[in-house]
């Protein structure tokens, strides 16, 4: 059982080591711990015996072990930390006109990677939970057409396709009406189920020639199952991990699945210190944080970095960026859902943000 003083010593060593990356000796702790150097050394030895500290080869000081970082994150790290010095910089970074959702999420990933020096990942709302709210087909020529699918009344997905050679002149209109009548208002998960169960029978009923019709359904709607994901700072991973991690980051859909499955529905923030079941992430820290995309649902923000990262700094940056990001997304969707609405981050708003009044 770790004592209160030992906990304070471990916290200080973690903070000092992540800031300087130098082993910490007992004398360096005396100003903050109300005990003699000998007592501190004795507690450091006990922490080492418990596996929370380890000796450095070139110094008499100690540094946190993997277990030490895990204990610190689980027992001492405040997940609500915000450094007000970062707020203004983050707000200014989001002061641009966005033409689509992807512009905002991409900017957030770039900013998070830049400010943390780690790998940043932003994931849109989980595909299966999104709802199909619009479907149109635009015929481009005699041989090809464009399917326009709208998710959650705001996110368009376009799929260009070749019209099957066996399609009759009326088949495209039948296809359009079937989708509008059977799929509109359903979640992507429900649509996936219907494609596998009732759609084959419906195709047999409404199409004289059924060849390629099911394939066309599958082709168009397969685009809804892909994660919208933004990954920045991949090269940075080479500084804190091996080539396996870098190669893992090169497969966005695999990354999306691994990171999404690592945080449960009832968790808002989760930090895994070398605890991932994904082999490429087993020797790194992954911080995952949920944020709201207005009118649509919950999205995810992740930081992937070294085990010895500055955790308090990382938590603060994630909190600040996610909260300002939500403000930006709120303005964006408010604009889309109004007849005429202009959005500017005024100086008064910036002052309120800096005081923390708009970040709750």
Swiss-Prot record:
Matches recorded under SUPFAM superfamilies: GAF domain-like, Winged helix' DNA-binding domain
Stated name of the protein: Heat-inducible transcription repressor HrcA
Gene Ontology terms: biological process: negative regulation of DNA-templated transcription
Gene3D superfamilies, A to Z: 3.30.450.40, Heat-inducible transcription repressor hrca homolog, domain 3 (3.30.390.60), Winged helix-like DNA-binding domain superfamily/Winged helix DNA-binding domain (1.10.10.10)
Annotated InterPro entries: GAF-like_dom_sf, HrcA, HrcA_C, WH-like_DNA-bd_sf, WH_DNA-bd_sf, WHTH_HrcA_DNA-bd, WHTH_transcript_rep_HrcA_IDD
Family statement: Belongs to the HrcA family.
One Pfam family of this chain: HrcA_DNA-bdg
Its biological purpose: Negative regulator of class I heat shock genes (grpE-dnaK-dnaJ and groELS operons). Prevents heat-shock induction of these operons.
Span of the signal peptide: none
Gene Ontology molecular function: any one: DNA binding
Keyword terms, alphabetized: Repressor, Stress response, Transcription, Transcription regulation
């Amino acid at each position: 059982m770790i004592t209160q003083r030992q906990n304070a010593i471990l916290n200080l060593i973690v903070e000092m080591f992540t800031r300087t990356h130098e082993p910490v000796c007992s004398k360096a702790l005396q100003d903050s711990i109300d005990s003699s150097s000998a007592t501190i050394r004795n507690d450091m030895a006990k922490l080492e015996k418990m596996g929370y500290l380890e000796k450095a080869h070139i110094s008499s000081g100690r540094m946190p072990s993997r277990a030490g970082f895990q204990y610190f994150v689980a027992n001492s790290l405040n997940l609500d930390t915000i450094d007000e010095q970062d707020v203004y910089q983050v707000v200014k970074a989001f002061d641009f006109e966005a033409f689509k959702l992807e512009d905002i999420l991409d900017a957030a990933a770039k900013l998070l990677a830049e400010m943390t020096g780690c790998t940043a990942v932003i994931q849109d709302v989980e595909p299966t939970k999104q709802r199909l709210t619009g479907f149109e087909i635009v015929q481009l020529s005699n041989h090809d057409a464009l399917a326009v699918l709208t998710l959650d009344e705001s996110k368009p997905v376009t799929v260009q396709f070749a019209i099957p050679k066996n399609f009759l002149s009326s088949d495209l209109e039948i296809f359009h009406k079937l989708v509008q009548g059977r799929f509109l208002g359903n979640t992507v998960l429900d649509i996936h189920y219907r494609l596998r169960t009732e759609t084959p029978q419906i195709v047999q009923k409404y199409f004289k020639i059924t060849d390629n019709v099911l394939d066309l359904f599958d082709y168009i709607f397969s685009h809804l199952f892909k994660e919208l994901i933004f990954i920045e700072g991949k090269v940075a991973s080479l500084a804190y991990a091996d080539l396996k991690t870098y190669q893992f980051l090169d497969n966005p859909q695999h990354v999306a699945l691994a990171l999404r499955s690592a945080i449960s529905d009832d968790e808002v923030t989760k930090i895994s210190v070398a605890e991932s079941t994904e082999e490429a992430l087993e020797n790194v820290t992954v911080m995952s944080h949920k944020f709201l995309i207005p009118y649509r649902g919950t999205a995810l923000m992740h930081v992937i970095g070294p085990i010895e990262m500055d955790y308090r700094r990382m938590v603060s940056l994630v909190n600040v960026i996610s909260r300002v990001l939500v403000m930006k997304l709120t303005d964006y969707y408010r604009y889309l859902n109004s007849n005429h609405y202009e959005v500017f981050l005024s100086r008064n708003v910036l002052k309120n943000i800096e005081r923390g009044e708009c970040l709750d």
